[in-house]
């Protein structure tokens, strides 16, 4: 980004050499007044944008931290899931075994 050469104060305090066929001093003053106003507006806009940029960067950092926490807790839950599934599978196998004993036990008796 290009650096700013003049501040509003520098522009205001700038003196021009006067020559016989020089520019109209009032016209130059009016123009420079407008330039100073523009400069002040630009500086104000830059400050607002920098503040917004900082605020958005902080919000982004917060969201990234939250996302990381969610990922970490999701990984922990994923790692715990196989244990719960194996316990469930074991219960299912026990039920199947009990049902087979009942079904095949009835067939043998009949």
Curated annotation (Swiss-Prot):
Keyword vocabulary terms for this entry: Cell cycle, Cell division, Cell shape, Coiled coil, Cytoplasm
Major localization class: cytoplasm
Any one Gene Ontology cellular component term annotated for this protein: cytoplasm
Entry's Gene Ontology BP terms: cell division; regulation of cell shape
Gene3D superfamilies according to UniProt: 6.10.250.660
Family per similarity comment: Belongs to the GpsB family.
Annotated protein name in UniProt: Cell cycle protein GpsB
């Amino acid at each position: 980004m290009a650096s700013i050469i003049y501040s509003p104060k520098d522009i205001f305090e700038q003196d021009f050499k006067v020559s016989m066929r020089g520019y109209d001093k009032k016209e130059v003053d009016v123009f420079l007044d407008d330039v100073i106003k523009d400069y002040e507006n630009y500086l104000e806009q830059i400050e607002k944008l920098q503040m917004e940029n900082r605020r958005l960067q902080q919000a982004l950092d917060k969201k990234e931290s939250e996302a990381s926490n969610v990922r970490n807790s999701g990984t922990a839950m994923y790692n715990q899931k196989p244990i719960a599934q194996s316990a469930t599978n074991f219960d299912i196998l026990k039920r199947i075994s009990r049902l087979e004993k009942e079904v095949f036990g009835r067939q043998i008796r009949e």
